[in-house]
Regions:
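ASCE RecA-like P-loop NTPase motor cores
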Residues: 1-182
Length: 184
């Protein structure tokens, strides 16, 4: 079975931003990385974001065009949609919703428990393994653990997703209005 984040975890990885809101730009960047967005120098495709000075560009999948958020210190001065090719403004808006760019979502407080489970399983398998394979196996596990801690969205992370407490199957979304955000 393919696991997905619980409805609660999905909602915690959504963010509404309004003109006049106060938010630290670095907190916004951390949120975007945790929600699966890739930091790039220029936003020209979905699931990317960039930051230049007091401007953050985000391309969220629920919109046809990327979003530009201009900050004055920690206050959102304006929000607009722009053309990713020409960089010209399409429309100014007062509010936007950012939804996750991945279904590999988990809470920071769960990572320690999952890392412990991985290490316990690793030790058990490591003892039974032929010496020829031990170094490569250990290196792979350590890389996977670092990727989990960094909220990397590498597909290899799905191997550990079942270890998180706040995961479920897609059926739990069927009676929830959050589906209105997802275009199937």
């Amino acid at each position: 079975m393919r696991y997905v984040p619980s409805v609660d975890v999905f909602k915690k990885n959504c963010m509404t931003l309004k003109v006049g809101d106060h938010i630290d730009v670095y907190d916004l960047q951390r949120f975007l990385v945790q929600a699966g967005y890739m930091h790039t120098t220029r936003v020209d495709q979905p699931f990317n974001f960039s930051k230049r000075g007091g401007v953050v560009d985000i391309f969220s999948m629920q919109y046809d065009h990327p979003i530009r958020i201009d900050f004055f210190d920690d206050e959102i001065d304006y929000i607009k949609f722009f053309d990713e090719k020409t960089q010209r403004t399409i429309e100014k808006v007062d509010e936007i919703e950012i939804i996750p760019a991945t279904d590999l979502l988990y809470l920071d407080q769960e990572v320690g428990s999952v890392v412990t489970q991985i290490k316990d399983s690793f030790e058990e398998q490591y003892q039974k393994m032929d010496d020829l394979f031990k170094d490569d196996f250990e290196e792979k596990i350590m890389i996977d653990i670092e990727n989990l801690k960094a909220h990397a969205t590498d597909s290899s992370q799905y191997a550990y997703y079942h270890l998180f407490k706040n995961v479920t199957s897609i059926k739990d979304y069927l009676d929830d209005p959050i589906l209105s955000l997802i275009h199937i």
